[in-house]
């Protein structure tokens, strides 16, 4: 059974999401994982077809092509800002327990519960980017509202000026 690759992401999100009391229980996971394996093998087959497309978009290198290793890994760890705990260490699949620190200490960062967790398996992504985008959208909306109010006030002032 061949599965299109665009079904892979929702399937991974469903299976790999953090577990809560309302999480889905899969008792017969054999077909699901066989679909995942098939989709991953298709992605690996199509990888060579995607390389010219990526090179046209002027990417410096593909991650699998650059064997430089440690320097690039250190740079990516420094560039990314949200904590994500991998499967190493923790309770169950992926150690999904987090605690929030105060915003003054570490703005928008999540830290795992366990202080003994492996630092090499964590990377961080920034929460500031979506916040900045939302702030920009709110500012645009405020500016539109202010322009509409200014136009209404100008119209009222013109009507008042005509009456005098």
Curated annotation (Swiss-Prot):
Residues with the Isoleucine amide modification: 160
GO CC, alphabetical: axon terminus; extracellular space; varicosity
Subcellular compartments: Secreted
UniProt keyword annotations, A-Z: Amidation, Hormone, Secreted, Signal
Record carries keyword Oxidoreductase: no
Example GO BP: neuropeptide signaling pathway
Any one Gene Ontology molecular-function term assigned to this protein's record: corticotropin-releasing hormone receptor 2 binding
Tissue: Expressed in some areas of the brain including the hypothalamus, amygdala, and brainstem, but is not evident in the cerebellum, pituitary, or cerebral cortex; it is also expressed peripherally in small intestine and skin.
Free-text function comment from the UniProt entry: Suppresses food intake, delays gastric emptying and decreases heat-induced edema. Might represent an endogenous ligand for maintaining homeostasis after stress.
Subunit structure, interactors included: Binds with high affinity to CRF receptors 2-alpha and 2-beta.
Name this protein carries in UniProt: Urocortin-3
Species of the source: Mus musculus
GN (gene name): Ucn3
